[in-house]
C-alpha cells in the first residue's frame, strides 16, 4: 500500500504516479527486505496484469527506483525514514504496517489504496522434526487449527491482516477496503521462481539500469536499518 502525507499533496493514487518527476519514494532495500521485494513484485505486476509487456514493466521499474530516495535495510527503518525523518512523498509497505504507521502519526499521514497490488500471504508450517513429542505436536496442531477459526480470523482483521473468510473481511471493509490483488502466478510460476527471476544475481532487480544521474552507481543509498 502507499502511505502519503496528510491530504495527499502530491496527488498519488496509482502506480504510474510514483514515476512522475520530483516524486520521492521510500521503500526498503529488496536485497535485504521481504517488504522491499514485495514492492518490486507489486510494481512489476501493476504493469503486466493491466495489459503491459515485460519490457514495459522493466521500464517502469527502472523509473520507479530512479525516484527512490533511500533504501533502508528493513521495513521499520523505512517507516522511520518516512514518518520520523519525514523524507519522501510516499512510502511503500505492507497493509498492516501502513495502518500502524498512520495510527502512530495521528493527523499527519494517510493510506492510499492503488487499484491493484500483489496478494501477499504469510505462511504457517508444520515442522515434523520439531514435533516428535506427542504433547508438543498436539499443542501445535491445536494452534494451527485455531488460526483458521472465525475467532482467529477476526483477531487478524483487527490487526490489519486480511482474513481469508469473505464474511469476516466484509465486516472490516472500512479499514480493509476492496482492492484487486493478483497472485504470484500472474508474474512467475511460483514464489521460488519469482525469487530467481527477480532477485538472483542475474535477476531483473539486479540488472535494471542504474541511476547515474545522481553521480552514483545505484538508485539510492543503501541505508542500514534502525
Regions found by a protein language model. Name each.
Residues 1-3, 110, 123-125:
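Residues embedded in well-ordered beta-strands
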Amino acid at each position: 500500500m502507499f502511505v502519503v502525507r496528510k491530504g495527499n499533496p502530491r496527488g498519488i493514487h496509482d502506480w504510474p504516479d510514483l514515476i512522475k518527476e520530483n516524486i520521492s519514494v521510500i521503500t526498503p532495500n529488496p536485497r535485504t527486505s521481504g517488504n522491499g521485494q514485495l514492492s518490486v513484485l507489486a510494481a512489476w505486476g501493476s504493469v503486466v496484469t493491466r495489459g503491459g509487456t515485460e519490457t514495459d514493466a522493466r521500464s517502469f521499474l527502472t523509473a520507479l527506483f530512479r525516484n527512490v530516495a533511500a533504501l533502508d535495510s528493513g521495513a521499520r527503518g523505512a517507516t522511520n525514514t518516512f514518518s520520523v525523518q519525514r523524507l519522501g512523498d510516499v512510502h511503500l509497505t505492507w497493509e498492516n504496517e501502513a495502518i500502524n504507521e498512520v495510527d502512530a502519526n495521528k493527523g499527519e499521514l494517510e493510506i492510499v489504496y492503488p487499484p491493484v497490488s500483489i496478494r501477499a500471504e504469510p505462511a504457517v508450517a508444520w515442522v515434523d522434526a520439531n514435533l516428535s513429542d506427542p504433547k508438543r505436536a498436539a499443542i501445535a496442531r491445536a494452534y494451527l487449527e485455531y488460526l483458521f477459526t472465525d475467532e482467529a480470523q477476526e483477531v487478524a482483521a483487527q490487526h490489519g491482516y486480511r482474513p481469508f473468510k469473505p464474511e469476516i473481511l466484509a465486516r472490516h471493509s472500512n479499514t480493509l477496503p476492496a482492492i484487486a490483488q493478483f497472485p504470484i502466478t500472474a508474474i512467475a510460476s511460483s514464489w521460488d521462481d519469482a525469487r530467481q527471476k527477480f532477485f538472483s544475481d542475474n535477476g531483473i532487480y539486479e540488472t535494471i539500469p542504474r541511476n547515474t544521474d545522481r553521480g552514483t552507481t545505484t538508485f539510492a543509498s543503501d541505508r542500514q536499518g534502525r
